[in-house]
């Protein structure tokens, strides 16, 4: 469990550093649905941009620099969706000011960099923003696994892709942490760690890099979790948009059709299959209530700040996640299995 904190009376007040798309289009709208905390401020490198989004989203305070928001004594928690190379520096800066930080994934560019966040003051919570672990479909799927309905778990298979060849997009900038492994491979890795409830021992990967961007545009890996448990995944930034998670055991299989970008407009479904038919005839559809995973994520983080409920996944978990990504990149160079 992640270390917790005890906040004084009054709602937790959030600040958002950056007007990145994921924040203003997904995370902040989800947060604004909640009455469990306040979204007090938003910051951008340019004040007019911050003011524009503050007005559009109904956020009271706008800042023209990240440092101004971090220094605001009225802010208790910060959400950091900055480009990947700024995750650790700005998260650490905020933590040293006593702010709790929910940082977008990946939490850093390497495990060594992520470990710098261990310098956060005692009682300050730092966590990686894997919103999927708060969605009812993931929680239900894991509950099915833990109850043994799939038998002995053997494999987790993940596909996740989209098409983006825009040279101005941060996902295509190698020097600041662009590429498939950082952007969406992290979801595949967390899928294996979540459902196996274990840490992998070794990785072998195959990576194809864009000849112009030098980012990994297709990354595939086989991840060994020991005891006959395998995670296999392919992720890509220049493929048709698609996502799927399959969890397979000796007695059954779970399929999550929209595992990562679950829509908020309607109920979600996962499929439980006993494998008696090669098609889907034997599959049972399990309907889950509609939910905003970003809202649920922020509420869980807020409860941890308030001392009401410890986070299940904190900084230690984020560092373990980065160790797997490190091994994926080492295997690309060695063309061999790499220990995690």
What kind of region is each of these model predictions?
Residues 52-59, 117-122:
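Short, conserved SAM-binding/catalytic segment
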Residues 209-216, 226-297, 314:
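NAD(P)-dinucleotide binding in Rossmann-like oxidoreductases
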